[in-house]
Curated annotation (Swiss-Prot):
GO CC list: cytoplasm
Keywords from the UniProt entry: Cytoplasm, Heme biosynthesis, Iron, Lyase, Metal-binding, Porphyrin biosynthesis
Gene Ontology terms for molecular function: ferrochelatase activity; metal ion binding
Gene3D superfamilies, per database record: 3.40.50.1400
Locations listed in the record: Cytoplasm
Gene Ontology biological-process entries: heme biosynthetic process
Name of the protein in its database record: Ferrochelatase
Purpose of the protein: Catalyzes the ferrous insertion into protoporphyrin IX.
Organism of derivation: Agrobacterium fabrum (strain C58 / ATCC 33970) (Agrobacterium tumefaciens (strain C58))
Recorded catalytic activity of this chain's protein: heme b + 2 H(+) = protoporphyrin IX + Fe(2+)
Keyword Cytoplasm carried by entry: yes
Domain of life: Bacteria
Length: 344
């Protein structure tokens, strides 16, 4: 711990400084699967103007009058299906904690670096972890939204929340925000390795490999959000790295919500169409998620698989996210080391 008391007057209070913080931030998670934890989480998530850009006069009556009365039970049941019962938490929290611990171990050669993790929605909050890093002497903090592809509804809202807290601080730490890494060679190599490793465990070869990204409304893209372009580039680079063609590799978008048109093609409609067209074996992966969560474990490994098999498909496999694997941590570590340059 840096104290450098010799640089201070003899009667100066003991202070810590000279540290650099790294804060890994993912989307968030409810604290439990029953009604009230789910309602608190969904209220925070769906009231974010970056997520739902509709007029508050239009959206809030729908949110508080309909959505938050009906959706907590439905979403809670879905979380219950993929809950980490051993730790009594979501796997997103389990993996993000592990990523933070492994990152701290990987950066031991920088004794002045402190690693922590937070969630944009739910706990631990971004504000609480910024305060914790400051208390440990961090005068500089690298803020790492764990999203390879930039979107206003993901990366930007993490940055918003961090700076919202900084507005309340008398003494602000210096902040760097990690840029998108959708085309980083280490990221593409990690994804390609995860595909090869997973397919090597199968006794069959998929006819089609689908990269399913979380969708956003088309209106967001038309307003200038680069997310769609980032997803397309990631998919193209991964396809090239795997030596596949557009005949056996495709990109889709999932998790649409509400009446708007979202980015297409839709994942659920696509797997249904492939099965009806006679495709018997497919593999689906989620390159935009650094950790498995509700959208990958329940929506893809569960629901999408059921749709495909119900409509005539015979073999379905979900390729896990990079999570806290060696390949996954290699990607995150390389990004962090690059972005820390000049600070350590």
């Amino acid at each position: 711990m840096a104290t450098e008391l010799s640089a201070l007057p003899a009667n100066h209070p003991r202070v810590t400084f000279g540290k650099v913080g790294v804060l890994l931030v993912n989307l968030g998670t409810p604290d439990g699967t029953d009604y009230w934890p789910m309602r608190r989480y969904l209220a925070e998530f769906l009231s974010d103007k970056r997520v739902i850009e509709w007029s508050r006069l239009y959206w809030y009556p729908i949110l508080y009058g309909i959505v938050l009365n009906k959706r907590p039970q439905k979403v809670g049941k879905a979380y219950e299906e993929i809950w980490n019962h051993e730790r009594n938490e979501s796997y997103l929290r389990t993996y993000t904690r592990s990523q933070g611990e492994l990152m701290a171990a990987a950066l031991k050669d920088f004794p002045n670096v402190v690693v922590d993790w937070a969630m944009r929605y739910g706990q631990p909050s971004i504000a609480s972890r910024i305060d914790a890093l400051k208390e440990q002497g961090c005068e500089k903090i690298l803020l790492f939204p764990l999203y390879p592809q930039y979107a206003a509804s993901t990366t930007a809202t993490v940055n918003d929340k961090a700076f919202e807290h900084l507005m309340k601080l008398r003494w602000q730490p210096a902040i760097r925000t990690v840029p998108p890494y959708h085309d980083d060679p280490a990221y593409i190599e990690g994804l390609a390795a995860s595909v090869k490793n997973h397919l090597a465990t199968l006794d069959w070869e998929p006819e089609m490999l689908i990269t399913s990204f979380h969708g956003i409304p088309q209106s967001y893209f038309k307003k200038g959000d680069p997310y769609y372009c980032h997803c397309q580039k990631t998919a193209r680079l991964l396809r090239e790295a795997l030596g596949r063609t557009e005949k056996n590799f495709m990109i889709t978008f999932q998790s649409r919500f509400g009446p708007e048109e979202w980015l297409q093609p839709y994942t659920d409609k696509t797997v249904e169409k492939l099965a009806s067209e006679g495709i018997k074996r497919i593999a689906v992966m989620n390159p935009g998620f650094v950790s498995d969560c509700l959208e990958t474990l329940e929506e893809i490994a569960g629901e999408a698989g059921e749709i495909f098999l119900h409509n005539g498909g015979e073999k379905f496999t979900h390729i896990p996210c990079l999570n806290d694997s060696t390949e996954g941590m290699n990607v995150l570590e390389k990004v962090v080391r690059r972005e820390l340059q000049g600070w350590v």
